[in-house]
Amino acid sequence: MTIVYDVTGHKGGGGKQHTPQETPDSLHSLAKIRILLALGEGEFEGITSASELRQRVYLDGTPIQNADLSENFPGARVEFRPGTQHQDVIHGFSAVESEQSVGVKLENGTPWVRQINDTSLDAVRVRIGIPALYTSEDNGDLVGGRIDYKIVVYTDNADPREFTFAAVGKTMSLYERDHRIELPPNVNTGWRVEVHRITADSTSAKVVNDIQVQSITEIIDARLRYPLTALLFVEFDAKAFQNIPRVSIKCKGRKVLIPNNYDPINHTYSGDWDGTFKRAWSDNPAWHWYDICITERFGLGRRIKPQMLNRYALYQIAQRCDQLVSDGNGGREIRFKNDMYIQSQTDAWTVLKDLAAIFAGMTWWGNQMLNIVSDQPVAAVSHTITNASVIDGRFDYASGSQKTRYSTFAVAYGNPKNHYDDAIATGQRVELVRRHKINRLDITAIGCTRESEAQRRGHWALISNQLDQQVSFKVGMEGLFFIPGSVVAIADTNISGGFETRGGRLLSDPGTRTVLNTDSEITFRPGDKFLVRTDSGNVETREIASVNGNKVTLKTALDADPIPDQPFCVDGDDIQLQKFRITDLEYDDSTSTFSVRGIEYNDSKYDAVDNGARLDPGIFTQVPDGVMKGPESVTITPSQISSQGQLITNVDIVFPPVKDAVVYEIQWRRTSLQNMAVQWGNDWVNIPRTASNGAHIPNVFSGNYQARVRAIGMGEISSPWVSSAITPVEGRLGGLNAPIITNAISGLHQILWKWNHNNAATDISYTELEVRKTGETEWKFLTNVPYPGAEYAQTSLEFGIYQQLRARVADKIGNLSDWSAPFEGQVSDKVDEYMKGLDDEFLTSEDGKRFQEAIDTVPQGIYEAMLTDAQQLFNARAEYKGIYAEIKVAYNVAADAHKAVAQLETLIGTRLDDAEAAIHTLQTAQSTQEQAFAQYQQTVAAKFSEQEAAIQQVQTATADVAGALAEYKTQVAAQFGQQSAAIEQKMTSSFNHAGGSATYSLKAGVTYNGTYYDAGMQLSVVTEGDAVKSSIAFKADQFYIMHPSNGSLSSAFIVDGGAVYIDTARIKDATINFAQITDTLQSNNYDGDTRGWRLGKDGTFINLGTGNGGGMKQTNTQISVKDGNGVLRVQIGEITGSW
């Protein structure tokens, strides 16, 4: 089938007298741009009129219609669909089209071909382009032309369908036309589309008639409504733009679920909310957050159900968003609103956090719910926390570094006056600029289209950055009651200064609603408030009326009963409680504890953000700032009183009180009145710390006195010392006599010092002792011995050293005597005493007693089952005339209210006449209310008549309230008649309240003719109190240490009986009570001629010095001296005339 289409233009006229003329263009492209935009998930708030719609739609930022109804784009067509379920179809977009560019020039005889395999298509649209079409006549006229072409469609094996077209007329620029070609239905493999040029190709420059295929579009016809999708359709003349313009619309967005008592336009609430919703448009960010959570099509509704959200907490947040605040220009506006347009798929958690950030919110998952909290003021704290209610009483604090301290901000927001392009709102906190200089914080305010709100967000960020102190602590199962976002009050004595009790716990008997029983007496000031959680589940705050010991009386009764052992805090104006908002909870299953973290909370923050009010930093400590000042003056005032007929002189030290001082440290000293140069004989005497501004010293000696005082504030901040003038005082005559050291008794590693006090005074307090090694100059403090003690044992000293001691006495008010004369003593240097003492010390100790224990050398074979009342699990036995082989497995289990026990026994045994062999195991586990016990025992034994051999292994573990014990023992034993031998290896570790020990021993024993002989070794470490001793002991008649030499062994060290033999010894420092020389004693540099010395067994002593020449020789009858040349110079005794 052939269809012919003609498109005809017109040509110019003629005349007899001809002037070349050009025919006007008669071919014009008339292209329309049609755009269909999916604005978002519906349903959107509707647009009431066509005029309103045209004024809300923009092409490249220009509205289609102005407010005065004048048109900027005449003929433009605009349609809007809000995204309802059954919305109308937008006409003009009745198909789904896919356009593909081609741009191929057609030539006669060479068609353009495209194979189409998508059998779901309904039609194709072929766009033809003619760059220019004209003919230049011989007379110079420029007229139109003609070009013919056809489109042919081939379908499977059917006859082709042919469509013929012609373009007639003139154009000097690109002329385009579209041809929609219906495709035959019911095909199997698809279609082939061909475009042919019928007109012959031009061969003359006078004829211009090129033609080309511009594009092909695949079309599927449909009447699409796009339910639940808001749509915008725009159609306009393509000649109005060089490129496709940006299309935008200013409209209200998606309708969301809001409370049924809420007016979203006026942002008001009527009456109480019953928890039900209605669907309407709203710019309240809280309900947008809720909508994202529950919507299944594009949100989290497939995973989050409405019952998994706290709608009432969200209702409170939404009301805060709608509260009116200053707009900075004298007006009022709602606090937060959301103009966010989500245009792309994003991680759900990120979207929720971004939405929550609009109202300073935090999203978290807990208790099988998705929770949301906002940074907003709280009416009351949720918990009271003290050092007594956290693990180890410890709070850890942290804050940001100087680099993260910001003072100015730049907030980017969408400016509606400039088509919502980004604009910048800037601001600063003056006090932060003074402190941190200029450090700008850059923020993008999501969903913000108001400069005033951008300002508030910037100030909120700066103040939050300023209030960035973080706290972390650990609690037990009380952490179950902590909720992220809740605010807690903390009374930390380390912060408050530690001098006052501002928190604790109620007793197990908490008291009444008016009078509460606390675990300690609190510090109370008028107006202080008592905070404690009650049975209502809330923390109640009441003003304190009075405090009497551990009883606190409230001015107003609590609303509910107090809870036993509940933490409490005291809040006041002078010292306020720290408050933190909980941000994170982490449970440690291994310790059953919660790690809690929080960020600083300040009630004044929110008024500072909304209205620019001053931020109140709070007072949380009594520790003063800066340096503590000392007293302005210190005065010594003597006074006299008569007591029992005696005149007694006292001294008072007085000074004015110091601001912020908690206690004072006072010292004084004295010298004699005759000491005009004031060389102090006494060191400073300390008076115990006092909170009063003075001290009293009774019954003083005469002398020149001086005192000094310093003030101590919170946190142990101390002032400089302030001294008094030197003041003469007439008091008791004389002074304390120096004690007399009477004896120094030598002992093993100790000296027992004894002295006489040498004083008639009855008010002696103690004797001060100082020591030094003989030959040293510096004295070191040893101890103070309370009166009337007159001896002291100085222990843990080195062997044989000499020590010097000096002493002085002090009376009860601090007067000191002069030092006594030094007295010298020596630590014992008698080796036999040390050896006997060390022997006794070791052998009488617990590990020494274990070392002396004899082992049982008789084998302990087990050939029969031991669990007589056990239940039998398995028994296999073969027997023939008294000869048998058997295997037994038995068990015993029992449990009652006081004990649980389990035992398992195995026995493998054989017997033939007098020959027996067995392998036996017994495993026991037992638990009682007082002890846990486990033991594994294995015995391998063989017996023939009276000969027996056995290997036994026992492993035992015991634990109870008193301690723990673990023991591992292996014994190998053999017996022949009455003779027996055994080797035992034993490892024992134990610990209890008194101390602990670890011991390893190895013993070998023989019982021969009724007498026991053994050898062994033992390693042990024993703790007793603060002392720890380790030892290695050997027991043997002979002890050898050998080394290989030239292929054989030789002894380097031998102990035989009580004698020690050493082959070669090098000793750095030796103390010898008695030495026997069996050959020669000489120096290591002795060469027999020029240097060194030598003492021979025959008594000859030769001393040659260090090699400078000369020498001396001494025998039992002669002394001879020679010079450096070997010439004899002196000879005494037997005169021989020769060296």
From Swiss-Prot:
The keyword Transport does not apply. Ubiquitinated by the Bil antiviral defense system when the Bil system is expressed in E.coli MG1655 and infected with this virus, or when this protein is expressed in a strain with the Bil system. Coiled coil: none annotated. It is found in: Virion; Host cytoplasm. GO terms for cellular component: host cell cytoplasm. InterPro entries: GpJ_CSF (IPR015406), GpJ_HDII-ins2 (IPR055385), J_dom (IPR032876), Viral_Tip_Attach_Protein (IPR053171). The keyword Ubl conjugation applies. Its main location: virion. Attaches the virion to the host receptor, inducing viral DNA ejection. During tail assembly, initiates distal tail tip assembly. During virus entry to host cell, binds strongly to host receptor in an irreversible attachment. The binding induces structural changes in the tail leading to viral DNA injection. This is Tip attachment protein J. It comes from Escherichia phage SECphi4. The gene is J.
